Amino acid sequence: MSYQQQQCKQPCQPPPVCPPPQCPEPCPPPKCPEPCPPPKCTEPCPPPKCPEPCPPPKCPEPCPPPKCPEPCPPPKCTEPCPPPSYQQKCPSVQPSPPCQQKCPPKNK
């Protein structure tokens, strides 16, 4: 017999199972001394600052003048204009007698 066999005279036993730790009582919920006050701003928020005012919109180039597809044709009359008709004939002008006396007769 070896030395180890002489020492063990009874069969080996598993180690004892440790019981779970027991708390004396459940933990109480944490107590706040008082409710938290609302956050206080030191000053009102400043208005947002834009880096610079917006530039006016830029067109790529000025609009070209409108182009007609072709020049307009001259207006066409549907019928020729009639010759002007005089309503009455002008009477022949005769110098009055006093006028004839003032003017010398023309030499032809």
Curated annotation (Swiss-Prot):
It comes from Mus musculus. Expressed weakly in uterus. Cross-linked envelope protein of keratinocytes. It is a keratinocyte protein that first appears in the cell cytosol, but ultimately becomes cross-linked to membrane proteins by transglutaminase. All that results in the formation of an insoluble envelope beneath the plasma membrane. Residues 12-22 have a biased composition (Pro residues). This is Small proline-rich protein 2H. Residues 1-22, 83-108 are annotated as: Disordered. It is found in: Cytoplasm. Sequence repeats lie at residues 21-29, 30-38, 39-47, 48-56, 57-65, 66-74, 75-83. One of its GO terms (biological process) is keratinocyte differentiation. One of its GO terms (cellular component) is cornified envelope. Residues 21-83 are annotated as: 7 X 9 AA tandem repeats of P-[KQ]-C-[PT]-E-P-C-P-P. InterPro entries: SPRR2.
